[in-house]
């Protein structure tokens, strides 16, 4: 067994097969692959493709509808639960007494902002909630008490309580219950712990603990007479603070000017008045209508000029921002176009590899076809000679050599044609990618000076900030123009490249179909050999 295995013929390695095929003139695939020049764009395209979300089955939705009324604690925190249980939903509306909703409108809850509608002795910590309870003990200094009787304690300083008997400390609260008016003064509470000195109420019943209000009389009678100082007691008239003064000193609406001293009086040491003012001084109390019209016109013109300057600067700032945004979008479009063109270059390289592999496959298929024909001839009957006619051996050899030569030339032509197309595509894509859309620093310097000199025609009292904005606007517009030209070139290059690759893809498709047919025919011929 060992001796037989030792003398058994070994299988040839791949390298030996390649050498044997090369020795007989059969084309083989070389290990020296072409270096990729757009491999980075291929990796970028693969990363972008991997970043896309994949499709998956729908299931495990944590926000699905849950049947109400269950008493488990694993419910949807956002589902509407109408049962009597307490769930983890902080925003649901529940009618239970121990609901944890701080925003619901429950009867008795811990809502600091909700309106309590209960009639029992509940307590609400809401500092802003309007209550409908009666007999409210409140410290609201601004609240209005308008309701019936209940018993509820609240600490809201702004709440509106609706009670008849208000035990309030509000110095400004006003009651709407009116039982009459006596003598022009009133009390605003039936049994008030503190009188409101500013309320305009209408109650007539007085309390022993109330104080006289000096400003509570309604402003219906205007009179400047006052008989009891500031008191608003049993008097026939009250002081109206809103009345228009009718005193003599308020009749003159024009400013009073000091009379100038007569220039005819001799100025000597005896009649010299040191307190006298010589010349007409400017009165700061003059009305605007009495200012000279020329001065008003000058001031209005100056204001209009300043307003125009501000408008010009504002428009310039808007133009700068607009050009910046446009330049940013142009740069983004340029980056996107460059990446797209680079991915087209990587695609062109892969198309070239596919063309080379198809060409090699066609050559191998032709060789396989010849081998199948030879095998069929050798498998004939022993009575039929397999060597052929010995008298035309030289002519058959010449025909075979001519056929091999033609096949080799055709293969070389196709390979060179593919290489030329690949080189043209590579150069076209390189030119589109390496095209610089910006100019050098020297060009930008002279261009800025030229733009600044041209901008002086429509500038008004410009400063350094205006000059900088004009330079930036001109520079941004120039760069936008350069990017627009580059984008146009990228678009044309991509269009040409896509058309070229479409043509190559059609050729690859035709070659692949032809190769498939030839392989199928060789397989059928091998199966028919017996």
From Swiss-Prot:
Its main location: membrane. Residues 142-160, 203-228, 258-268 have a biased composition (Polar residues). Residues 313-375, 467-529 form the t-SNARE coiled-coil homology domain. It is found in: Membrane. Residues 8-22 have a biased composition (Basic and acidic residues). Residues 1-274 are annotated as: Disordered. GO terms for biological process: exocytosis; hyphal growth; protein secretion; vesicle fusion. Disulfide bonds: none annotated. Belongs to the SNAP-25 family. It is a peripheral membrane protein. This is Protein transport protein SEC9. GO terms for molecular function: SNAP receptor activity; syntaxin binding. Disruption phenotype: Leads to defects in secretion of degradative enzymes and defects in hyphal extension. Residues 61-100, 122-141, 161-202 have a biased composition (Low complexity). The keyword Transport applies. GO terms for cellular component: plasma membrane; SNARE complex. Late secretory t-SNARE protein required for secretion and proper cytokinesis. Plays an important role in the secretion of virulence-associated extracellular enzymes and vesicle-mediated polarized hyphal growth. InterPro entries: T_SNARE_dom. Keywords: Membrane, Protein transport, Transport, Virulence.
């Amino acid at each position: 067994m060992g001796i037989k295995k030792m003398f058994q013929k070994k299988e040839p390695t791949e390298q030996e097969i390649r050498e044997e095929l090369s020795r007989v003139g059969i084309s083989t695939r070389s290990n020296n692959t072409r270096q990729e020049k757009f491999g980075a764009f291929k990796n970028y395209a693969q990363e972008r493709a991997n970043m896309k979300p994949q499709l998956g089955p729908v299931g495990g939705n944590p926000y699905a509808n849950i049947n109400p009324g269950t008493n488990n604690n694993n419910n949807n925190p956002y589902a509407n639960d109408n049962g009597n249980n307490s769930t983890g939903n902080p925003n649901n509306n529940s009618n239970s007494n121990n609901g944890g909703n701080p925003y619901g409108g429950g009867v008795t809850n811990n809502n600091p902002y909700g309106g309590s509608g209960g009639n029992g002795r509940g307590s609400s910590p809401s500092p802003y909630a309007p209550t409908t309870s009666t007999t409210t003990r409140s410290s609201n200094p601004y609240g209005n008490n308008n309701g019936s009787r209940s018993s509820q304690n609240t600490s809201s300083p702004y709440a509106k309580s609706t009670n008849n008997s208000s035990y309030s400390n509000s110095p400004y609260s006003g009651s709407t219950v009116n039982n009459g008016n006596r003598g022009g003064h009133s009390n605003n509470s039936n049994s008030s712990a503190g009188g409101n000195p500013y309320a305009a109420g209408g109650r007539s019943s007085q309390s022993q603990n109330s104080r006289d209000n000096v400003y509570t009389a309604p402003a219906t009678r205007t009179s400047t007479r006052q008989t009891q100082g500031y008191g608003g007691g049993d008097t026939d008239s009250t002081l109206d603070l809103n009345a228009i003064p009718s005193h003599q000193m308020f009749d003159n609406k024009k400013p009073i000017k000091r009379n100038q001293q007569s220039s005819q009086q001799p100025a000597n040491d005896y009649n010299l008045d040191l307190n006298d003012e010589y010349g007409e001084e400017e009165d700061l109390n003059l009305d605007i209508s009495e200012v000279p019209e020329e001065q008003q016109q000058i001031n209005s013109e100056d204001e209009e000029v300043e307003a125009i300057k501000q408008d010009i600067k504002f428009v310039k700032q808007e133009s700068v921002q607009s050009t910046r945004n446009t330049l940013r979008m142009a740069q983004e479009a340029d980056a996107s176009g460059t990446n797209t063109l680079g991915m087209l270059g990587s695609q062109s390289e892969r198309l070239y590899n596919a063309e080379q592999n198809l060409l090699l496959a066609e050559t191998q298929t032709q060789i396989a076809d010849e081998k199948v024909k030879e095998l069929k001839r050798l498998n004939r009957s022993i009575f039929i000679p397999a060597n052929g006619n010995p008298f035309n051996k030289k002519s058959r050899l010449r025909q075979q050599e001519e056929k091999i030569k033609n096949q080799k030339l055709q293969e070389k032509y196709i390979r060179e044609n593919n290489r030329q197309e690949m080189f043209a595509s590579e150069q076209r894509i390189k030119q589109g990618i390496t095209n610089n859309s910006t100019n050098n620093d020297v060009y930008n310097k002279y261009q800025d000076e030229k733009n600044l000199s041209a901008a002086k025609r429509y500038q008004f009292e410009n400063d350094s900030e205006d000059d900088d904005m004009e330079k930036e606007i001109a520079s941004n517009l120039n760069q936008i123009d350069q990017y627009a030209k580059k984008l146009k070139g990228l678009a044309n290059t991509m269009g040409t490249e896509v058309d070229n690759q479409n043509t190559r893809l059609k050729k690859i498709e035709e070659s692949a179909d032809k190769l498939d047919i030839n392989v199928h025919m060789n397989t059928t011929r091998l199966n028919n050999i017996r």
